[in-house]
């Protein structure tokens, strides 16, 4: 067991193109969002294990001795593919939670317990440690916050238990794990996601692990080679929506108007493929024309999504505001409210960006200036973290 403090971060994700079409076998492009989740793991010898999640007001601690006495044979031995619904029920018993608890606070604690007990059972004794996780990502907004949480937990626990090495080299501010170690982190993070979501696609944890951009189609996930980092505005309309209902609405529209809706889905697929091609070209040398093409694809996709019936007045307003400032936007994720993204070309001047952000805030939206194509899960030195992150990890 390592004795040093570990500081780990992982990015969120946005869908660039292909939302809804992906449900019908088409390509989706998911990109790592540089709003990150940060984890601090502090080993100690007080015989307790603590979990602090200041964003959602969770503070829990357990005696290691009592966890040690639990029959955890149901977890399998270091097998990251063995999680079943029965295991989740058993974890609820262990945590003293009601059987029907499905709120984010309870599920976050269950995912932690699952990963801690499973990964650390290789140790002679369960380790005493404190884990604090603080995130720049809003929860429940379709931005992969639970996957970033699971990825941070898996990476930190695997490193602390010396299942994988700490990749941080002397004199470096941040370190990334090898491909083989990332595979293991991703496997465990997927199990954490299964505790939280039941039956996730695996896209969110893969994007958070590897960063950059991924292509997803019918269960197959592949990385795009060296995608460019694109500056964006991420806007949360704060209009709640149900992904399940929106997906069902698209399906019923497809059944009602197959000749109309099937070609829309094919067109969205073509938009995703064209975007993938452009991003590939940009890896070598981005040109102003590339950015103009990306903007055209954003506009076309937004209109297609409106035709599928997953738009919303708040998203129309978002697009109108950004268009008035010469920028191009689309919804990201399920639609019906939720979040949108706006591409910031390199030639957009500072005053225009600030004016756009003010106008969006004036609509009651939350707005972040950030980037996509961000690095995946990383380990950091304390000195390299922003003061706001340090403060977040010290809160509660």
Swiss-Prot record:
Similarity comment: family membership: Belongs to the GHMP kinase family. Mevalonate kinase subfamily.
Pathway per the UniProt entry: Isoprenoid biosynthesis; isopentenyl diphosphate biosynthesis via mevalonate pathway; isopentenyl diphosphate from (R)-mevalonate: step 1/3
Binding site for Mg(2+): 146, 193
Keywords: ATP-binding, Cholesterol biosynthesis, Cholesterol metabolism, Cytoplasm, Kinase, Lipid biosynthesis, Lipid metabolism, Magnesium, Metal-binding, Nucleotide-binding, Peroxisome, Steroid biosynthesis, Steroid metabolism, Sterol biosynthesis, Sterol metabolism, Transferase
Main localization (coarse): cytoplasm
Active-site feature positions: 146 (proton donor), 204 (proton acceptor)
EC number(s) per entry: 2.7.1.36
Source superkingdom: Eukaryota
GO cellular component: cytosol; peroxisome
Entry annotated with the keyword Nuclease: no
Free-text activity regulation comment from the record: Farnesyl pyrophosphate and geranyl pyrophosphate inhibit mevalonate kinase activity by binding competitively at the ATP-binding sites.
PANTHER family in UniProt: MEVALONATE KINASE
Protein name (Swiss-Prot/TrEMBL): Mevalonate kinase
Subcellular location: Cytoplasm; Peroxisome
Gene3D superfamilies for the chain: 3.30.230.10, GHMP kinase, C-terminal domain
Cofactor: Mg(2+)
Function of the molecule: Catalyzes the phosphorylation of mevalonate to mevalonate 5-phosphate, a key step in isoprenoid and cholesterol biosynthesis.
Binding-site residues, ATP: 13, 55, 135, 140-146
Catalytic activity: (R)-mevalonate + ATP = (R)-5-phosphomevalonate + ADP + H(+)
GO molecular function terms attached to this record: ATP binding; identical protein binding; magnesium ion binding; mevalonate kinase activity
Subunit structure: Homodimer.
GO biological process: cholesterol biosynthetic process; isopentenyl diphosphate biosynthetic process, mevalonate pathway
């Amino acid at each position: 067991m390592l004795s040093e403090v570990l500081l780990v971060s992982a990015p969120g994700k946005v869908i660039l193109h292909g939302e809804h079409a992906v449900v019908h076998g088409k390509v989706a492009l998911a990109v790592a969002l540089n709003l990150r989740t940060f984890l601090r793991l502090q080993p100690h010898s007080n015989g307790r294990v603590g979990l602090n999640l200041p964003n959602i007001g969770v503070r829990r601690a357990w005696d290691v001795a009592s966890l040690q006495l639990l029959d955890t044979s149901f977890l399998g031995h270091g097998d990251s593919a063995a999680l079943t619904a029965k295991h989740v029920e058993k974890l609820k018993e262990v945590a003293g939670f009601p059987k029907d608890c499905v709120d984010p606070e309870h599920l976050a604690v269950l995912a932690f317990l699952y990963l801690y007990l499973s990964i650390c059972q290789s140790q002679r004794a369960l380790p005493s440690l404190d884990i604090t996780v603080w995130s720049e990502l809003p929860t429940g907004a379709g931005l992969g916050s639970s996957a970033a949480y699971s990825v941070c937990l898996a990476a930190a626990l695997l490193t602390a238990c010396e299942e994988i090495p700490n990749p941080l080299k002397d004199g470096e501010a941040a370190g990334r794990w090898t491909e083989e170690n990332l595979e293991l982190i991703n496997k465990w993070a997927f199990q954490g996601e299964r505790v939280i979501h039941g039956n996730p696609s695996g896209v969110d944890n893969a994007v958070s692990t590897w960063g950059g951009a991924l292509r997803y189609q019918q269960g197959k996930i592949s990385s795009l080679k060296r995608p460019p980092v694109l500056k964006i505005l991420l806007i949360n309309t704060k209009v709640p929506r149900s992904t399940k209902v929106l997906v069902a609405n698209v399906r019923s529209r497809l059944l009602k108007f197959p000749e109309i809706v099937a070609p829309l889905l094919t067109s969205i697929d073509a938009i995703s493929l064209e975007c993938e091609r452009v991003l590939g070209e940009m890896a070598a040398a981005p040109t102003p024309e590339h950015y103009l093409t990306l903007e055209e694809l954003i506009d076309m996709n937004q209109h297609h999504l409106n035709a599928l019936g997953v738009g919303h007045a708040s998203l129309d307003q978002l697009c109108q505001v950004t268009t008035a400032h010469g920028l191009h936007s689309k919804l990201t994720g399920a639609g019906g409210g939720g979040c949108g993204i706006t591409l910031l070309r390199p030639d957009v001047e500072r005053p225009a960006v600030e004016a756009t952000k003010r106008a969006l805030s004036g609509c009651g939206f939350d707005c972040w200036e950030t980037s996509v194509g961000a690095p995946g899960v990383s380990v950091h030195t304390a000195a390299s973290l922003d003061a706001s992150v340090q403060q977040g990890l010290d809160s509660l």
